[in-house]
Amino acid sequence: MKVTKPRFFSLICALCLVFGTVVPLAARADAPTFTVGWSVYAGWNPYFYMQKSGILKKWADKYGIVIKVQRFDYATSLDSFVAKSIDACTMTNMDALDMPAAAGVDSTAIIVGDYSNGNDAVLVRNGLSFGTLPGKPIMLVQKTVSEYLLERGMVLNGQQAQLSKLRLINTSDSDIVAAFLNNKSNQAVVTWKPLVSQIATDKSVHEIFDSSKIPGEILDLLVVRTDILNTPDGQRFAKAITGAWYETVAQLAAGQPNAIKYSAAASDDTVDSYKEQLKTTALFSTPKAAADFATSPALQQKMDLVRKFCFTHGLLGQGVKSVDDVAIAYPNGAVQGDKGRVRLRFNAAYMQAAQQGKL
């Protein structure tokens, strides 16, 4: 049968439509895939909205990759990152040092998201104070910033000599609220919002210390394995997730209703509760603010406190004989510790690229 020109043109169009859809899908099936772990926290909940809104997919598509975000309990997210089950993870500066870095997993912070400015707190019952805490059971997620906050509170309240008498009860963040509230014999707990707010609904509980007393010491980061970041695909991932992050937080900072609604929903919170948490989260809502902090002397000063805490508490790994054995590298080329043993790196390049509109 002879094909006339109009029908031939229609056939060509049909083939273009078929192959135009099939080919990209086939390419996407082979696209590099990256998984980001996150856990419930005011400064990390935006990853949920980022995925829900399509912002993440838009940026991943731009760089020809697939990015998945997966929610974890906090300690489990760190374990998964150390085990190399995920490629990137939200974590604090201290945990970046005492978990992956201490375990020998060379890691790089590419986004400095915020610092806790009252989100982390020490809460007690029965009128306890730092002077009467020693010997009492204290519920917290051990080897995290909760333990750091507790010690800083003790030191700043003149109780450094009593540190060895603290009795710590390791409790998962997913269990800590119910475990504390359902047993009145539990007298002290250290955790973060929204868990702090939930515990504080008990009128017998009051706060004796929070992270606003130590501004900039508890940082919330996105950390990527350095071996991944050193590959072309890993660099595309870093650009995509950074671009998606700053588009997301710009909406959050502007009060965009869906940004707040879904970020609140990420932790089963109300919008009002989430807004209250944001008040005690010093969010670096622009890449310039984040890059400026990441390249400032203040970061190195804060990290020096953190690394000394980690070493004193044996959190830098077995056989570590000096605080310098797990070194930290900064954007200006400075290194705290042995230059041959750098395991944690702060890289401002992607934040700066976002600032310059080059992502």
Task: Pin down the residues of each PLM region.
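Short, glycine-/small- and polar/acidic-enriched structural segments
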Residues: 30-170, 179, 187-193, 216, ...
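Conserved C-terminal helix/tail region of periplasmic/extracytoplasmic solute-binding proteins
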Residues: 307-359
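Predominant activation on well-ordered alpha-helical scaffold segments within soluble catalytic domains
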Residues: 48, 97, 151, 197, ...
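Sec/Tat signal peptide C-region and signal peptidase I cleavage site
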Residues: 22-29
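N-terminal secretory signal peptides that target proteins for export/translocation
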Residues: 1-5
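Pocket-lining segment of extracytoplasmic ligand-binding domains
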Residues: 95, 162-169, 174-271
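Bacterial N-terminal signal peptides
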Residues: 10-21
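Secondary-structure end/capping motifs
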Residues: 230-319
